[in-house]
A protein has these predicted regions:
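Extended surface/linker regions that mediate inter-domain or inter-protein docking
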Residues: 1-67, 75, 87, 91-235
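Short cysteine/histidine-rich metal-coordination sites, predominantly Zn2+-binding motifs
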Residues: 71-82
Length: 235
């Protein structure tokens, strides 16, 4: 699952006017030197195509400086206080539905950025991938369409649990208006053992750290069958 790697890489070039600045960094994504994917973006090969998508670190990693002139230090586990996650969702949805998101516009950019494509990739794989990505984004973000009923979350904030409800098919049209907004700051996730038994979530409705972490993972697209319990337990 996830976005084809090269399609993800060229989206900011296809629709630069739909971003607040240059590239994904303008939405608060963090890039480490020597890496071509932002922190919190995992990559794996599926059905012969390299695919990328968000993982937990995208919301729970940020940088700090010891002085205004110091080099930023990446700190895992702290809130991603510059990340505009709603902005990212809206950008992807708008770009894949834009008239520019076509094989004629996108494939040449991939060929240029990747150093060249074989005939199979140029004529079949990526043209098909463009249509599949449009359909996939329509399916996923169609479920997350409730974000268009909300005010902008702003950087460092997310409506995680409405996202989880949406992914699992909760009919938002049946929810009372006061339940449509559940936006909260990204939390720090270090020293979680000390939080066991505390009243967790933004409304304090659960006391188990494990449940909080699983619910957050479901909100970013994890599924009960595929979720990595061991990796989540390490935090």
């Amino acid at each position: 699952m996830g976005f084809p790697y090269w399609l993800f890489q060229v989206l900011p070039e296809v629709c630069p006017d739909l971003l607040p600045g240059k590239g994904y960094a303008s939405l608060g994504f963090i890039y480490e030197p020597g890496h071509d994917l932002p922190v919190g973006m995992s990559q794996r090969r599926h059905m012969g195509i390299d695919r990328v998508f968000l993982n937990c670190a995208v919301c729970h990693a940020a940088t700090v400086r010891t002085s205004p002139d110091a080099k930023p230090m990446l700190v895992a586990g702290m809130p991603a206080n510059q990340l505009d996650l709603m902005g990212f969702q809206k950008f992807v949805q708008a770009c894949v539905n834009d008239r520019r998101f076509t094989p004629a516009q996108v494939v040449p950019r991939i060929a240029e950025k990747s150093g060249g494509l074989g005939i199979l990739d140029e004529r079949i794989i990526y043209p098909l991938g463009i249509h599949l990505m449009r359909d996939g984004v329509a399916g996923l973000l169609g479920r997350l369409n409730f974000i268009h009923l909300q005010p902008d979350w702003g950087p460092g904030r997310v409506d995680t649990f409405n996202s989880a409800k949406a992914i699992f098919g909760v009919p938002f049209e049946r929810l009372p208006k006061e339940e449509l907004v559940g936006v909260a700051d990204f939390p720090a996730i270090w020293n979680q053992g000390r939080k066991q038994g505390m009243q967790l979530h933004w409304d304090g409705n659960n006391s188990r750290v494990e449940e909080r972490n699983l619910s957050a993972a479901f909100g970013t697209g994890a599924t009960p069958k595929l979720i990595d319990h061991a990796a989540i337990a390490r935090i």
